[in-house]
Amino acid sequence: MSTNNSDIRVVVGMSGGVDSSVTAHILKEQGYDVIGIFMKNWDDTDEFGVCTATEDYDDVIRVANQIGIPYYAVNFEKEYWDKVFTYFLDEYKLGRTPNPDVMCNKEIKFKAFLEHAESLGADYVATGHYAQVKKVGDEIELLRGVDNNKDQTYFLNQLSQDQLKKVMFPLGGMEKTEVREIAKKAGLATANKKDSTGICFIGERNFKQFLSEYLPAQPGEMRTLNGEVLGKHDGLMYYTIGQRHGLGIGGDGEPWFVVGKDLKENVLFVEQGFHHETLYSDSLIATDISFTTNAEKPKTIECTAKFRYRQTDTKVTVHLREDGTAEVVFADPVRAITPGQAVVFYDGDICLGGGTIDTVWKNGAKLDYVG
């Protein structure tokens, strides 16, 4: 055990899953002064009256006791509601498709949680994210995780230098299979626990049903771009650009896809064919632009970008504008760019930062994806 690490306090965000369990285990093995914190972000009771957060916290307790670290539960429900859930609902009201994971990392895990950890004397916080940080000169670079399938830099694109200087990602250099193996060898209680998927506050519940509890659904017409009425939609908030499932349009030929929303008229526009021309665009305007380093940026950046999680990178040219927005021009047309989602910039394995997709363009004209 390294002696110098024992003077360094690391507070680990523990969710009750295998990734954060192994994160805490590794840091403890490396001799750090480790504290486990369970973040309670949502008052979550399933249909049987069981609070799933309680089950997860029980797993945190089991693992913390196994590896011999102190643990606490901290309630961030108010911060989460104000900063993440309110944003989530507001975006749906605007007809967009939000990314709560990006906002949660920016406002909760690496802000509210980081501040709480510092009040406990933390030198660093650590999470089970599949990403890497590397010190280069005076700055910290955010790098993709080694496991391509699990890399989570897309969701971390809004982190600043001040945040990155305080984080550790022990799993960033590992494949998921290795993480499971470490958990099994260490006999951790969460070694065989299945990964959680989807949006944390929805859990296993039906998305439509969940959203309708907070936003009133307004059914309306489903039309082609030529105005032919094909049926009814359940509420514009339930649909996203490029969506195929749940439209309820039968018949012969190719499947139908969502190609736009008219909020004023409450109309959902659909067209036939995966490669319908309306689904393709050549540029976008992004807001909330944030970079992971403080270095001076040129007005034009040649790099690659992701427009959704686990998507293959696309070559782009980013033009930073005076108003703080950015025009992102694609080397090749891209399908189903979705307003409200994150656009994230990369230079090789370095995550440069990103922003929020606001409008989508083709041949110099704005597409009416959300109008």
From Swiss-Prot:
Q: What class of enzyme is it?
A: transferase
The main place the protein resides is cytoplasm
Supply one GO molecular-function term.
ATP binding
For biological process, the GO terms are: tRNA wobble position uridine thiolation
- Which region ranges are annotated with the description Interaction with tRNA? 150-152, 308-309
Enumerate the residue ranges of region (Interaction with target base in tRNA). 99-101
Site (Interaction with tRNA) location in chain: H129, Q341
Question: Which cysteines form disulfides?
Answer: C104-C200
Q: Which residues form the active site?
A: C104 (nucleophile), C200 (cysteine persulfide intermediate)
Annotated keywords: ATP-binding, Cytoplasm, Disulfide bond, Nucleotide-binding, RNA-binding, Transferase, tRNA processing, tRNA-binding
Gene3D superfamilies found in the cross-reference section: Adenine nucleotide alpha hydrolases-like domains, HUPs, Translation factors
Listed Pfam families: tRNA_Me_trans, tRNA_Me_trans_C, tRNA_Me_trans_M
Any one of the GO CC terms: cytoplasm
Database matches in InterPro entries: MnmA-like, MnmA-like_C, MnmA-like_central, MnmA-like_central_sf, Rossmann-like_a/b/a_fold
Q: Where in the cell is it found?
A: Cytoplasm
Query: Which residues bind ATP per the record?
Result: G13, M14, S15, G16, G17, V18, D19, S20, M39, G128
Q: What does this protein do?
A: Catalyzes the 2-thiolation of uridine at the wobble position (U34) of tRNA, leading to the formation of s(2)U34.
- PANTHER family cross-referenced by the UniProt entry: MITOCHONDRIAL TRNA-SPECIFIC 2-THIOURIDYLASE 1, TRNA 5-METHYLAMINOMETHYL-2-THIOURIDYLATE -METHYLTRANSFERASE
Q: What protein am I looking at?
A: tRNA-specific 2-thiouridylase MnmA
